[in-house]
Amino acid sequence: MVKLVFARHGESEWNKANLFTGWADVDLSEKGTQQAIDAGKLIKEAGIEFDKAYTSVLKRAIKTTNLALEASDQLWVPVEKSWRLNERHYGGLTGKNKAEAAEQFGDEQVHIWRRSYDVLPPKMDRDDEYSAHKDRRYASLDDSVIPDAENLKVTLERALPFWEDKIAPALKDGKNVFVGAHGNSIRALVKHIKKLSDDEIMDVEIPNFPPLVFEFDEKLNVVSEYYLGK
């Protein structure tokens, strides 16, 4: 059976500060760095060997991927980066403290923005300091593709082509795959993999640690699902 390991990035500096992060390129905290290393140790203990690895273009996921691969003695494994694995874009909430946002907009509204499948948060202004429209890493993309806000539905729509073009074919080819990504991009792909309803995915949480493992048969039916070390 082939294995797919999802590793959400370790705790970031903005996770620690309780800020909405989205596409802001925030670094790992000291705790997050250790979580990434520990993820790699769990992978090594489980004897999982990878053939391919994928991550986003955000440093917290890139560093988590590299640290986990290094700790599992697999730093040589080819890593492909894609914006399609980025975190959900939190729009105008980016950089805001979650508790302060709840005070400003109300607990219920913020909960809907965070957990609903298809409700968009407020859009980010294109002149915002965190706008991806002026970020060089997205210069090759058509401007209309770069989001100003995303919900989980839109996140899945932009992540799904990468699943279909890269990850799924590798798994069907018998290759074990590592994906270092983000809470919501992983949630979106888990929804697709498990065929969850829009309501069911609302209750799914992806922790910073430990990694989540899926085992598939040759037709990519899920045979088992578990967290390493549990």
From Swiss-Prot:
Organism of provenance: Streptococcus thermophilus (strain ATCC BAA-250 / LMG 18311)
UniProt entry keywords in alphabetical sequence: Gluconeogenesis, Glycolysis, Isomerase
Function: Catalyzes the interconversion of 2-phosphoglycerate and 3-phosphoglycerate.
InterPro entries (alphabetical): His_Pase_superF_clade-1, His_PPase_superfam, Phosphogly_mut1
PANTHER family tied to this protein: PHOSPHOGLYCERATE MUTASE
Active site feature: 9, 87
Site (Transition state stabilizer): 182
Lineage: Bacteria, Bacillati, Bacillota, Bacilli, Lactobacillales
Pathway(s) this gene product operates in, as recorded in its UniProt entry: Carbohydrate degradation; glycolysis; pyruvate from D-glyceraldehyde 3-phosphate: step 3/5
EC number(s) given by UniProt: 5.4.2.11
GO molecular function: phosphoglycerate mutase activity
Protein family according to the UniProt entry: Belongs to the phosphoglycerate mutase family. BPG-dependent PGAM subfamily.
Binding site for substrate: 8-15, 21-22, 60, 87-90, 98, 114-115, 183-184
Protein name in UniProt: 2,3-bisphosphoglycerate-dependent phosphoglycerate mutase
Primary gene name: gpmA
Catalytic activity entry: (2R)-2-phosphoglycerate = (2R)-3-phosphoglycerate
Enzyme class label: isomerase
Annotated SUPFAM superfamilies: Phosphoglycerate mutase-like
GO BP: gluconeogenesis; glycolytic process
SMART domains: PGAM
